[in-house]
């Protein structure tokens, strides 16, 4: 009887990139539907939507046009803080841990200290996105001043920044980016890594996370459980079948990338597909410190829904 | 003297022009082709000189991508999806523009409202409408249609209203003399009289509908299934398939040229040029 | 010749009572006509005669309902004149009074459909008939911008005539026509009036035309237009060549030419020749 | 009255040689005038007289350089007529020939500055003078849309006169003017011609005006306009009231009224009245 | 009869209107204020009814955010930055539009080129220009100016050219009669004669410059230091400071209203209304 009260349709939004591979696998292999049936629930009608940027995600979620949003962990924490007492968003699951890398085509730049006024660092979003926050964390560690590099940053989407960086004909000399752009840039030989986000955070950290409103999570606990189970299943499958996962990704995204290249990214030991959040509190602590959030969560469990608490998160 | 007059600036060409309209039309086509070839060559040359396919593919590479895109059927499907949204938004925009402009020409309050709304809302980017669009229409196509409507409504309304306001007094008096009802006065007098401006507004609205559609497709959410040409551009851009990105843009250009040639030029030739409202 | 005030008609079609028309406001206001009082019985044809810029067109527009009055009142059949309507069809002075997007036939037919509520076929038939009468059958399907000035005016005349209004407002309608065509148009006008009992308010600069067309002539003073004389045209004077005609013509001519327009005529100091 | 071909002038200002003007092409082509051959010596004033739609305005536009010829040649001082220029100032038939964004003074002054290359002050002085001569000093600073039809035409006349061109092209310039103003304008025209030796190509529908203004009258047949007669106006006929005047008037009248325009006149079957 | 005529539709109001222009102007202002108040109330009411400040803040909250934004100086600085870019792009767009339109009215080739370029480039979104813009102008302000120019150029050129083409024949002949040079003919005859359409184009160009600026600030590489009002909107949007987002939008609206009232209305009143080209 309770199952009938739960939602019959599930609207899930993702963004571009290989970071959303668990979603893509769940979609293509119809894992959510499968898990629902296994749990004895009617298979929900799943609608997969692509949106660009956390802001559009948030607005859609708050407007009730979406059930599950996804974005970088830092913007998610920010949204969690901002919506406390109103929309009350809450993490549903992490979408895996993978490093972001600051690359540069300027041979002189070996570390953050080597940037000069002539350098420009491209970031995919402004101020409060995932990469800008990590860059600020790194600047804080290096210079003791988190906004030291802000004046060098410009906002430019990943693909454009990559094209600019590789062209060598532009002011863009550095780019804080994510897979597969990291690997593409490094493989071209025209850029080298300057900084790895794992080093900044002190180890593997969640990159993207799925989140929803508390209201939805509380009204649909079984559906949420099914979703997490489906993501777990997707992660297990990816880990077990990296080659097939690469092929599936390429087919689903109509990607022109080389399957071996994608497979290499999936196999990268730094990349971990797991629903358990990693080092979420490192982000929240930093955000609290620089005043972007007003409440410092005591534990990652404050950020994520109860169904996840059994996982080994951090 | 014929020579002398032909040597005069085209803008000041005598009204006798219709004389050789038929031959002129052929001539025009020829010039257009020459210009198009020139632009294509320029593109090709510059892209080769640049030698950076990631930033700017050559024209030939773009055409190749275009042909492949159409051969695979994807580009055609995407274009169809976009056109469908576009037409819905365009249609809704035109209807609203017609209503607002009619209201504006019927009452002082309507006029003030139109002027106010145009001045206020026209400069707002599509992103400003997102919250309201999401609230009212949810994610996806209906919201897209909504922002396209916003993009079309104001240029068309503004141009039409400006056109209405510059209808000569004698023509207005002629219409009023027949005791026309307000809707008839608007539809049968003001609209044809302001047709040059309305057509300019329709052209602009069309262009802005495209611009907005492409820019909005991602912000407003699409699923791979329902994505249009904006989706095509974005996904290819995300994969650094620059030739495909430009193939998508070229498709927009081609659609623009076709619509211009068949629809707008045709409409102008069948109306304002035939009626002597345009030289 | 003094101002001959018209004896008030018992049941006038149109009555102007101290009509004053102004443009602009405040210090920059221009008075077009002042204090015009005249009645028009059914069947009357009043010709307005007066120097350029004395307010004839303005007065016609006011009667047509196109322009508000700033003083006095205009009554049509006892009721204040309201919005424009096809009961007062106007032929304007300007050449751009045809709808550019309709052919010659289309212009007249459209007016008949809308102004008289005729169906398309009936309107088309009547339109053809009238276009023939103004001698434009050849250009039935031509668009206005391909017509000569006089041809445009003739289409407007055909349109106004075809609607058979109670009151025709004609602002120098025949000014762009040659003598022969003009005479034919005058004949058509008189025949139409006879047939339908229409009244006419007619502006012209031709004294002979005034006598030929009008039952009364209202001569206006130079700007701002005031009533100078209201002269009935005796039946006898209507035939050109008669002495009555010659007398009336001479008297009107003296009236118009004699009193030089102090405002619009060049000050003598400024003139160098002739 | 047969076609009196003009004896070729030895050194004509303007010579038309078999001029034919057409609109449109192919089957839908309309011939406006056909085979016009006439010379104009310096100081000649040629009046075009002809029924509405016979191509008078078209011919004027062709001479002005606004319209290509489709047959024959037009020479000005021995050279093929080229682009329009201020040496051939035109007064068009339409009322919308003033620049709406310039005042009465501004319109005339601007024409003088551009057409004659005068500086602003000189142009302004001359403009004021001419505006005074057409009786419009009162509206010096008014914008064209606030003028009456006749007033607009007078501004255009003042503009054309002020430029003192070699050849004046005047298309029914006085049609919208009352008798007195019209006579004054005619006087101004004649005085100007006398003073500057200007030639004139003049379109009118008034026979008396033709005689008063012209040194020659070219009468055209109905559409398409062909030369019907080229009649010199004897000096003796120029004075109204003389028998020479009366004779010429009567002959022209017969010429124009007698031969009914088969094209533009209503076919007798179509006419019900008159 | 005055009453009867006043009861007639405003669109058909007699030309005698200037009669009470002075009193009318006051009247208009009054209506505008009423309408603005009505719109503000509507906003406030709907937002309260909705009760979702994260999505749509109330009007009063937005005004509070606006006041704070200006008090802190940030909003003013951001607006100034945006306006500077906007004016540069607008200016460049106008100059190019003038050149293209002049070219188009001088020669057949120019006309074909303008028509072709408008039909081709007008529908292209700003993103399409990104690669080329970055190539030519690099990151930041110059590229933004470039895309604003693109946004302004086409509507202004299209409107102006449509205006040029519908200048009545008699007016053209008058100009040619004076033997004007081509530039003079364009500047002193065609431009004032087409002013109603040109003004409509300028209004549209202004609006599209704003839209494009805001939309492009995110994609086109602005840094925190140099960001304008688009930056303000985006950063606040990313932080769900919705009241600030709407304060930014309200600023655009206010600027739009001021520019409309002072510039465009003023220009129209001083020109086309005074000259009787507009009722
Ligand atoms: N733009 C045009 N296109 C086609 N035909 C035209 C055009 N202008 C004039 N015509 C035709 O050419 C003929 C002559 O016209 P034009 O204006 O020269 O006559 P007109 O002698 O000046 O007449 P009016 O005395 O009525 O002014 C007419 O039959 C007219 O229909
Ligand atoms: N829209 C207007 N605004 C201001 N003044 C105007 C307007 N229309 C006409 N006038 C003025 O009113 C007066 C009368 O104009 P109107 O057109 O009625 O004269 P008219 O008798 O018809 O002259 P014409 O014989 O020259 O056509 C003129 O002095 C004119 O300047
Ligand atoms: Mg008049
Ligand atoms: Mg003519």
Q: Where are the regions a protein language model picked out?
A:
Chain C
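A short, proline-enriched helix->beta-strand linker immediately N-terminal to the Walker B motif
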Residues: 162-166
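Catalytic Walker B motif of ABC-type/P-loop ATPase nucleotide-binding domains
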Residues: 168-171
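Conserved ABC ATPase signature
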Residues: 143-147, 151
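Conserved ABC transporter NBD signature motif
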Residues: 72-84
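Helix-to-loop junction immediately C-terminal to a conserved catalytic motif
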Residues: 64
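Conserved ABC ATPase "signature" region
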Residues: 120-139, 191
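Short helical segment in ABC ATPase nucleotide-binding domains corresponding to the A-loop/adjacent helical element
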Residues: 105-113, 124, 232
